[in-house]
């Protein structure tokens, strides 16, 4: 199975968080772009993007949306919890004879056995194994892109550091653990870059990041940007967190708190959130300096002052 040129791409999940940047860079590179969506009527997409209705119930219901349209590649950027839909989409892509898939490999790496055994990963493993098995049989080719954290999302939603001041930042294992994060725009750029080099990127996994940052570093910038804000912290030991998470899980408590604590342990406590080596250069991604990260934090804090900011009198 070989393909020297990819020009016609379909996106599953193109109306979600990664959609705008992915569509932007694919169009910029001159590719024909279509988007699968469950709700074509309400999809708000650029005029030069084809919108295709999709039923993700099964591969059989989804395949007709892909067949006969000449797609060379499919980019799967469905909701990070839509694991069943990801497997369905991959099978439908095989049924339609699509050459290349970029599956949803954007989160943490599964290389560490302890992490792979965590409950939140057990739903991701079937997706990964399914892709690898299909590639092994020559049914499809793939390219994986591991991005670490989505930079915009973890800053917007107070996930990495509580920039809004609404709740304390949960500082993991001292707060000096380096973490890789990639801006949504750079993820779109990387996806487009991969598809422009189909032969070089066949059945490979790449690592990229826009910035490497620590919680203490970002907290420091935030405090500098808003000296009157509290930016409270809660120190957490990820080993203690994961022990409690396993206890809850084994007692049948499968709540968001448990999932969150497993993720925190995997990302911070086990160093799995930092990529010591990346493929930035190959993908055309430029890593930010500390000064650029500081400017980004200042911009965000100034635009949305923390709720507990004390306004100077006078």
Task: Give the residues covered by each predicted segment.
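A hydrophobic C-terminal alpha-helical subdomain
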Residues: 239-314
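Conserved Rossmann-fold cofactor-binding substructure of NAD(P)-dependent oxidoreductases
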Residues: 50-72
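Short, glycine-/small-residue-enriched flexible loop/hinge segments at domain edges that mediate gating
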Residues: 102-110
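A generic structural motif
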Residues: 105, 231-242
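Oxidoreductase cofactor-interface core, primarily capturing Rossmann-like NAD(P)-dependent enzymes
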Residues: 2-47, 57-60, 96, 109-230, ...
């Amino acid at each position: 199975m070989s393909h020297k040129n990819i020009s016609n791409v379909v996106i599953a999940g193109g109306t979600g968080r990664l959609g705008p940047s992915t569509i932007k860079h694919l169009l910029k590179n001159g590719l024909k772009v279509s988007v699968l969506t469950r709700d074509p009527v309400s999809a708000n997409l650029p005029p030069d993007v084809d919108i295709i209705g999709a039923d993700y119930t099964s591969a059989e219901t989804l395949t007709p949306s892909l067949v006969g349209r000449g797609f060379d590649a499919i980019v799967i950027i469905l909701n990070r919890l839509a694991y069943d839909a990801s497997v369905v989409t991959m099978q439908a892509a095989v049924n339609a004879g699509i050459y290349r898939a970029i599956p949803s490999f954007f989160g943490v790496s599964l290389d560490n056995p302890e992490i792979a055994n965590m409950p939140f990963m057990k739903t991701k493993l079937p997706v990964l194994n399914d892709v690898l098995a299909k590639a092994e049989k020559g049914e499809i080719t793939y390219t994986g892109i591991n991005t670490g954290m989505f930079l915009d999302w973890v800053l917007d939603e107070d996930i990495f550091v509580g920039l809004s001041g609404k709740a304390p930042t949960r500082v993991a294992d001292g707060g000096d653990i380096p973490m890789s994060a990639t801006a949504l725009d750079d993820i779109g750029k990387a996806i487009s870059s991969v598809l422009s080099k189909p032969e070089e990127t066949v059945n490979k996994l790449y690592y990229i990041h826009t910035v490497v940052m620590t919680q203490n570093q970002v907290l420091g910038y935030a405090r500098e940007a808003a000296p009157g804000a509290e930016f409270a912290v809660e120190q957490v030991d990820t080993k203690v967190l994961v022990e409690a998470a396993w206890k809850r899980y084994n007692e049948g408590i499968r709540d968001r708190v448990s999932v969150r604590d497993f993720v925190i342990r995997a990302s911070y406590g086990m160093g799995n959130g930092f990529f010591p080596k990346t493929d930035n250069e190959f993908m055309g991604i430029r890593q930010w300096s500390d000064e650029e990260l500081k400017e980004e934090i200042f911009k965000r804090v100034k635009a949305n002052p923390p709720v507990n900011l004390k306004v100077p009198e006078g």
